[in-house]
Design a protein with these regions (language model features):
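Beta1-alpha1 glycine-rich phosphate/pyrophosphate-binding loop at the start
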Residues: 1-77, 166-189, 328, 401, ...
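Rossmann-like dinucleotide-binding cores of NAD(P)H-dependent redox enzymes
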Residues: 59, 152-153, 160-218, 298-304, ...
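Short hydrophobic core segments
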Residues: 6, 103-113, 156, 234-244, ...
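Glycine-rich dinucleotide-binding loop and its adjacent helix/turn
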Residues: 110-172, 207, 267-269, 491-499
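A Rossmann-like FAD-binding core segment of flavoenzymes
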Residues: 25-27, 69, 75-96, 103, ...
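Mid-to-C-terminal Rossmann-like scaffold of FAD/NAD(P)H-dependent oxidoreductases
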Residues: 1, 284-396, 428-432, 436-462, ...
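FAD-site-proximal beta/loop scaffold in flavoenzymes
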Residues: 125-149, 221, 225, 233-310, ...
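Rhodanese-like catalytic fold shared by cysteine-dependent sulfurtransferases
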Residues: 417-428, 432-469, 477-510, 514-563
């Protein structure tokens, strides 16, 4: 069997190695347009920033190591320009020599990935306007940074690569401005959760110009102007385009393969295309979203590697299935970690899923053990079935651990209530006896059993302030004096029982505290005394973060003043 693989990064390289493990006698040829294979896309910004010191550390394998260990024929700096499905051949052009030749195949695997989205704007070809997708892109940017010593940079786009580059450039002393049309960074997060990311970026000197549209670029001596549709141009020493990626599928289209959403390659669960003996994997293919069941584009290394393995199994006569992706991701931004899995509120609304949510502010580990850091968790679940839909976490330590637990729970099709039963490891340096994931389950259990009702930050301003409802802030007087919601009366939780006679049982009570715990306790107390009560999800901290983009402070025992 002769297998030709087009593309040698995540999906292609994984498939090549897997095929060899399954079939020692297969002839495997991997053709890669760039000069590198099996490189770490996700590590490229950290090489620019000097966190990864040596270029060699970016490549997990080389053409030589692929041959020595796997006897795989890797051809870099060569581009497949055409596919003949009937003749089962590909046309290849050697980029350095210009030589053109054909290669036959028994099985063909397409792993071309995606290319940076470059809008048709004036000035994008400037030598000071960069994209970042390949090792060559990385080397070009690093040479520029080391040689020109830029003091200012504009990043067009606020996705993963854009934010990682913003962090690395800022850590090098470059003044960074992020410009993008959407009004929030990191699309997988809801806008309220993205507020914490905005605050962290600003805290480290990164300027955000959100809701603004780039109209073009213009060279201005040793700088470049970023032209904005409704604002004055931005002057900078360099520009990075990071507005997203587009599936690289011109080969598939020209060969007559069926295409999916946004021009991606349509495949089945076996990673087979519409043409026999042609498979496709990675950022170029559409997938089924595990939560919604709808077609989606999810450009992440994890799914690409899994798809490569599955395609290899089936090429070698197996029967493996790719059951979909839920888009689990994690990102480091200065001292913050942002992670998500499944769908957010916008996606749930688009899919027509009736959902509810909880917001909590747990600590990374037991607060009495030194070094505990706060995190903000948001968990979505389907109202009727209670199945988990998605989760978002932003904070310090322990974010990755919790998002992976929740991602596993979603994959296992657990209900939100089953989170309460998870037996998770505990020791004071690592967690609490009630892990944050358990706590999310407890909160959902109380909501669904009717023990408590909640309202959300975007409902605060619409609460009645005409005396027809009681608005209570149950934090300490010290906390209340530092800032409070308009119209809320301060009655500390520990004093609430002494003030019950001052409340009218015929009027609803809305309760607020710092993070939602004490207001929950207050509602449980008030409910048992005959009051109709609801508490603010996420509390004053979440409201403030969303409304003013201020980060929550380090955790301390709820109800105690931090001296």
């Amino acid at each position: 069997m002769k297998v030709v693989i087009v593309g040698g990064v995540a999906g292609g390289a994984s498939a090549a190695a897997r095929i060899r493990r399954l079939d020692e006698h297969a002839q495997i040829i991997m053709i890669e347009r760039s000069g590198y294979v099996s490189y770490a896309n996700c590590g490229l910004p950290y090489y620019v920033g000097g966190v990864i010191k040596e270029q060699e550390e970016l490549t997990l394998q080389t053409p030589e190591s692929f041959w020595d260990r796997f006897r795989i024929d890797v051809r870099v700096r060569q581009e497949v320009t055409a596919i003949d499905p009937e003749g089962k051949t590909v046309t290849v052009r050697a980029l350095d020599s210009g030589k053109i030749y054909t290669e036959t195949y028994d099985k063909l695997l397409l792993a071309p990935g995606a290319k940076p989205t470059v809008p048709a704007l004036s000035g994008v070809s400037s030598e000071r306007v960069f994209t970042l997708r390949t090792v060559e892109d990385t080397l070009r940017i690093r040479r520029f940074v080391e040689g020109q010593k830029p003091k200012t940079a504009v990043l067009a786009g606020g996705g993963f690569i854009g934010l990682e580059m913003a962090e690395n450039l800022a850590e090098m002393g470059v003044s960074v401005t992020i410009v993008q049309r959407p009004k929030q960074l990191l699309a997988p997060l809801d806008a309220d959760m993205a507020s914490f990311v905005h605050a962290e970026m600003r805290r480290h000197g990164v300027a955000l110009r959100l809701g603004e549209t780039v109209a073009g670029f213009r060279q201005d001596g040793d700088s470049v102007l970023t032209l904005l549709e409704e604002s004055e141009p931005l002057h900078s020493d360099m520009v990075l385009l990071a507005i997203g990626v587009t599936p690289d599928t011109h080969l598939a289209k020209d060969a007559g393969l069926r295409l999916g959403i946004r021009g991606s390659i349509a495949v089945n669960e076996r990673m087979e295309t519409s043409v026999p003996d042609i498979y496709a994997v990675g950022d170029a293919v559409e997938v089924t979203h595990f939560v919604t069941g709808q077609k989606a584009l999810i450009s992440l290394a994890g799914p690409a590697n899994k798809q490569g393995r599955i395609a290899a199994d089936n090429i070698c006569g197996g029967s493996s299935r790719f059951t979909g992706s839920q888009g689990s991701s994690v990102l480091k931004l200065f001292g913050l970690t942002a992670a998500s899995t499944g769908i957010n509120e916008k996606a749930a609304q688009t899919a027509g899923i009736a959902y509810d949510k909880v917001v909590l502010f747990p600590a990374s580990h037991a607060t009495y053990y030194p070094g505990a850091r706060s995190m903000t968790m948001k968990v979505l679940y389907e109202k009727e079935s209670l199945r988990l839909l998605g989760a978002q976490i932003v904070g310090g330590d322990g974010v990755d651990k919790r998002i992976d637990v929740l991602a596993t729970a979603i994959r296992a099709k657990m209900t939100a209530l089953e989170l309460t039963e998870l037996d998770l490891s505990y020791a004071p340096p690592y967690s609490s006896a009630k892990d944050p994931v358990n706590m999310a389950g407890f909160m959902i259990e109380d909501l669904e059993s009717g023990k408590v009702r909640q309202f959300h930050w975007d409902e605060v301003d619409d609460l009645p302030r005409d005396g027809s409802a009681a608005l209570l802030d149950v934090r300490t007087e010290w906390e209340y004096q530092r800032g409070h919601l308009d119209g809320f009366r301060n009655v500390p939780l520990d004093d609430l029982r002494e003030h019950l006679d001052e409340l009218d049982r015929s009027k609803p009570v809305y309760v607020n505290c710092q993070t939602g715990l004490r207001s929950y306790l207050a509602c449980r107390l008030l409910t048992q005394y005959g009051f109709a009560c609801a508490h603010l999800a996420g509390g004053y901290s979440f409201y403030q973060a969303v409304m003013k983009e201020r980060l929550a402070q380090s955790p301390y025992p709820c109800g105690m003043e931090k001296l």
